[in-house]
């Protein structure tokens, strides 16, 4: 029997701890100087790969990848649980890029994280038949959770996935066996949160108190053809508070330290759906286009690409990944392997105690219909004409 009842007393307790090392100062989770430098290098590598991909294609959106480099570095470098060898791993966290036009941000991060995306694939951005289409496609690219592009759609996708994880948790989690305790993280921009679909989905998430949902709001105050203030005067923070979200604001979304501190605090405890306001600069690092709508959806141009790399202090070599970044993500992959083994050991013990439930979970992972559901569907009957709302 499938139940969609919501349990308001349910508390989310994170099962995994991704913090490479942490110290506290004034209540903050701190990075040491080496870690600051390393995460900044990861952020700039995401930027470099992204603007090179857009420039080679002579088409795309460099603004978001440049503006969200630190967010990407902390997500894949510390926060998210993922398994490049199994994109449907039960224990993984889910990342959705609602602002799908910024797809080179996602492709660059997936490449660094060890997914089946090579440098050659990045070089084929927006080319027919490539693994790197202009907007993320679920069936084309390993590591892409859902197809996105229409602004705001990814927010609704994320709410649906978060609800799905909650339902699975209520069905299958047992004391000592937190099989489904996944975080669902969605990155959305000003344009996404102007769309009606994001309003409706967010309201629903707040109503259900989906405390596994994290909405990262890339607030750069820029839209496709001008300033956000030209077409919208919503108080987004107050709107989300009215939905029932908790709100955290990162004053400088281009600060590794601030992004890390905010996200790792969330990892420790979350009681409601969460809006994380990341105040970023669109096109960060571009000397002549940063902070303007001109960097949103057009290649920088060869001269500006070079100027941006010089301003960021990174190699001018195209599609360059520093050795230190490669080593960091190799170590990260080893950590993820240990977490995979940890989960598999737990699931093995779960299977001994809950054999039938474990079998159902395996079928779900393999996209098979559970026997109970198949049997229930076979016995459904309808009158000849029934309104859809009554089915």
Task: Please annotate each region the language model reported.
Residues 6, 10-14, 244, 333, ...:
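Prokaryotic Sec-type signal peptides and long signal-anchor helices
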Residues 1-29:
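Short, Lys/Arg-enriched N-terminal segments with co-localized hydrophobic residues
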Residues 29-183, 326-327, 331-391:
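Thiamine diphosphate
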Residues 7, 15, 301, 307-311, ...:
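Intrinsically disordered, low-complexity serine/threonine-rich segments
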Residues 84-85, 137-332:
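Glycine-rich ThDP/TPP pyrophosphate-binding loop and its adjacent helix/strand module
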Residues 7, 24-25, 132, 283, ...:
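Intrinsically disordered, low-complexity segments enriched in small/polar residues
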């Amino acid at each position: 029997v499938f139940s969609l009842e919501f349990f308001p007393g349910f508390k989310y307790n994170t099962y995994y701890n991704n913090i490479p090392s942490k110290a506290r100062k004034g209540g903050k989770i701190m990075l040491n100087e080496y870690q600051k430098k390393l995460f900044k290098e990861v952020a700039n590598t995401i930027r470099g790969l992204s603007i090179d991909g857009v420039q080679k294609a002579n088409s795309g959106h460099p603004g978001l990848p440049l503006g969200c480099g630190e967010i990407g570095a902390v997500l894949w470098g510390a926060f998210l649980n993922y398994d490049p060898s199994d994109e449907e791993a039960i224990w993984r966290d889910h990342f959705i890029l609602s602002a799908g036009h910024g797809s080179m941000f996602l492709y660059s991060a997936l490449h660094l994280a060890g997914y089946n995306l090579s440098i050659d694939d990045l070089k084929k951005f927006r080319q027919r038949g490539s693994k790197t289409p202009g907007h993320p496609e679920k069936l084309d690219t390993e590591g892409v959770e859902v197809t996105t592009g229409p602004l705001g759609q990814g927010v609704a996708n994320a709410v649906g996935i978060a609800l799905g994880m909650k339902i699975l948790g209520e069905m299958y989690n047992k004391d000592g066996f937190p099989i489904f305790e996944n975080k669902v993280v969605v990155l959305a921009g000003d344009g996404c949160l102007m769309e009606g679909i994001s309003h409706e989905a967010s309201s629903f998430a707040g109503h259900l108190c989906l405390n596994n949902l994290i909405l990262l709001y890339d607030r750069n105050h820029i839209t496709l053809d001008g300033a956000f203030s030209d077409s919208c005067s919503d108080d987004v923070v107050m709107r989300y508070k009215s939905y029932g979200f908790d709100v955290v604001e990162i004053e400088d979304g281009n600060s590794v330290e601030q992004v890390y501190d905010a996200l790792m605090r969330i990892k420790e405890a979350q009681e409601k759906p969460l809006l994380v306001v990341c105040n970023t600069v669109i096109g960060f690092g571009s000397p002549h286009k940063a902070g303007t709508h001109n960097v949103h959806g057009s290649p920088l141009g060869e001269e500006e690409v070079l100027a941006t790399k010089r301003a960021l202090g990174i190699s001018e070599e195209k599609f360059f990944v520093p050795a230190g970044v490669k080593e960091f993500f190799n170590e990260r992959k080893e950590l993820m392997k240990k977490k995979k083994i940890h989960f598999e050991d737990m699931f093995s013990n779960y299977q001994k105690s809950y054999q039938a439930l474990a079998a159902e979970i395996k079928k779900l992972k393999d996209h098979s219909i559970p026997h109970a559901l198949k049997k229930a569907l076979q016995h459904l009957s309808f009158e000849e004409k029934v309104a859809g709302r009554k089915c």
